């Protein structure tokens, strides 16, 4: 269909761009100081997390309202976010060589941060695409029960991401255990929502296509938050091993 052709075109263009830009990007890394690498990664992590927060929230609201245009925009934005995080892997090796020359531990955590960033944006993309395809194909929207559960989960995700984004911006990780507690509470809510949906399916009280979308959103939300928390933890270690306690933004 049209959407798949558009996606393949975007994907193809990205791969071509990656192949042509990898060499110049690698050359650029050689001229960067270790401090430059840290600052650039910090900025990318903050920017990506803040964008992901907005995309997730707007996607769920657009699903509730069956707003095809907004969902299409969210697919594009999540695609861009994912491919930007993947593109960093083209400069991974020269960056590692640069970091390992001064600190092997820093290089190790850099790899983790890049990987978790990629996995988090991938999970987000696995929410926006099915959501758009569902509405674009004129399938039945979510039920009131499904929408209510997702609105509650959306609020929980927003709370977690607000704390994560604040810690990333301030460079103050003192609330990281609270985020872990909020994450565990969210996962319990997701587990309960899945059980409730399976009961509705067994009782034939739920539309099949809507149920598939709903369960996909729940599963990928869990993946997204899990990777985000891992990302936060690795970013904390990354900074700790390289620079010690400090504020990121003066």
Locations of the language-model features?
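Cytosolic, long alpha-helical scaffolding segments
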Residues: 1-250
């Amino acid at each position: 269909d049209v959407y798949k052709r558009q996606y393949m075109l975007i994907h193809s263009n990205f791969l071509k761009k990656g192949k042509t830009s990898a060499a110049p990007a690698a050359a650029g890394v050689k001229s960067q100081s270790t401090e430059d690498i840290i600052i650039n990664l910090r900025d990318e992590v903050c920017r990506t997390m803040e964008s992901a927060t907005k995309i997730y929230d707007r996607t769920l609201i657009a699903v509730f309202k069956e707003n095809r245009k907004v969902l299409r925009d969210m697919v594009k934005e999540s695609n861009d976010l994912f491919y930007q995080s993947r593109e960093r892997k083209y400069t991974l090796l020269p960056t590692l060589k640069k970091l390992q020359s001064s600190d092997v531990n820093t290089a190790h955590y850099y790899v983790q941060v890049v990987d978790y960033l990629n996995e988090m944006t991938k999970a987000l993309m696995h929410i926006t695409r099915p959501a758009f395809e569902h509405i674009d194909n004129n399938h039945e929207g979510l039920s009131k029960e499904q929408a209510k559960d997702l609105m509650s989960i959306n609020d929980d995700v927003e709370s977690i991401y607000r704390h994560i984004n604040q810690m990333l911006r301030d460079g103050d990780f003192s609330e990281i255990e609270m985020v872990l507690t909020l994450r565990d509470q969210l996962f319990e809510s997701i587990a309960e929502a899945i059980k409730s949906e399976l009961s509705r399916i067994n009782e034939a009280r739920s539309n099949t296509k809507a149920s598939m979308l709903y369960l996909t959103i729940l599963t990928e939300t869990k993946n997204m938050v899990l990777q985000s928390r891992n990302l936060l933890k690795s970013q904390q270690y990354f900074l700790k091993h390289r620079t010690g306690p400090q504020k990121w933004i003066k």
